[in-house]
């Protein structure tokens, strides 16, 4: 992987990631394909809305169908018919989500499979092996996602364990051609975040992710962490904010220098009738759309908006038709890719803050301040 920084506008960055399987323009949003599919979307539709990289889930694919089935096809790209880059998470966040069903030790995490109840030990070495089998273009280290809320002592202990696992992940990754990203932990404590980043840089990674956010904290807490951490992150490496988020969350993180994002929000919300427009979120289940012949968003040129009315989408949703979920998802992911494209253009042209003012103005919201 090669990362090229093309332009800056304040702290915001316009860049490019280059892989043998293709290039990714940054800032970039990665649709989430948990089980080897971005829900309700074909790979061709993903390409059509402008996605250049997607995310796969190591934990879930390891459990079902298992790497042995995927490797019968080649790797995850072949299995799911996606020819562009794939980033896979390490499984750390999913293990964190199991809560009382897992036991963390120095070696790794023991847990009961949610599929068949068998006991599984997931270690940094095992995570690297699985991600290698998946053929990931970007591999994430195995870490412990610090719980929220956490005391400073709890956050420190968790962060230090993650640093030791990071070093083991690097050794296990070996000479794999895939990029390997470290993950900064440390909870809501700036000094611990700095220590985590320092330790990761000492080990040396191809990119650096910020983990342990979007786990229940408020926006002010998240921005406090980002405002402290972003100026310290290596400028020559890509920066990835994991699991974030809503359009306004992405805009604020881009203003602070983040390059990469992933989140299930656009696809999950699409299946639940929440649609993104330039003015904010539209609830298609609202009764006022029953006879509305207009598109979701007059300014949107996605397949859904070019061909279907709000009334039709409300009808499909009311009847629980699969097509409704598909059309809604096409629109929401198109909105996200358009958002990223506009952010890239604004940064490249040195007019990001003017674009941000327009973004919030259309939503009748004040522009948040950035240090």
From Swiss-Prot:
Cofactor: how and how many bound: Binds 1 zinc ion per subunit.
Binding site for Zn(2+): 300, 302, 305, 331
Keyword Zinc: yes
Cofactor: Zn(2+)
Region (RNA binding): 243-249, 267-271
Residues at which substrate binds: 89-93, 143, 185, 212
Annotated pathway: tRNA modification; tRNA-queuosine biosynthesis
InterPro entries: ArchSynthase1/Queuine_TRR, TGT, TGT-like_sf, tRNA_ribo_trans-like
A cellular component annotation (GO) from this entry: cytosol
UniProt entry tagged with the keyword Transferase: yes
UniProt keyword terms in alphabetical order: Glycosyltransferase, Metal-binding, Queuosine biosynthesis, Transferase, tRNA processing, Zinc
Active site (record annotation): 89, 262
Catalytically driven reaction(s): 7-aminomethyl-7-carbaguanine + guanosine(34) in tRNA = 7-aminomethyl-7-carbaguanosine(34) in tRNA + guanine
GO molecular function ontology, one term from the record: metal ion binding
Gene Ontology biological process terms, A to Z: queuosine biosynthetic process; tRNA wobble guanine modification; tRNA-guanine transglycosylation
Enzyme class: transferase
UniProt cross-references to NCBIfam families, sorted A to Z: Q_tRNA_tgt, tgt_general
Assembly with partners or alone: Homodimer. Within each dimer, one monomer is responsible for RNA recognition and catalysis, while the other monomer binds to the replacement base PreQ1.
Physiological role: Catalyzes the base-exchange of a guanine (G) residue with the queuine precursor 7-aminomethyl-7-deazaguanine (PreQ1) at position 34 (anticodon wobble position) in tRNAs with GU(N) anticodons (tRNA-Asp, -Asn, -His and -Tyr). Catalysis occurs through a double-displacement mechanism. The nucleophile active site attacks the C1' of nucleotide 34 to detach the guanine base from the RNA, forming a covalent enzyme-RNA intermediate. The proton acceptor active site deprotonates the incoming PreQ1, allowing a nucleophilic attack on the C1' of the ribose to form the product.
Family of the protein in this entry: Belongs to the queuine tRNA-ribosyltransferase family.
Protein name according to UniProt: Queuine tRNA-ribosyltransferase
Gene name tied to this protein: tgt
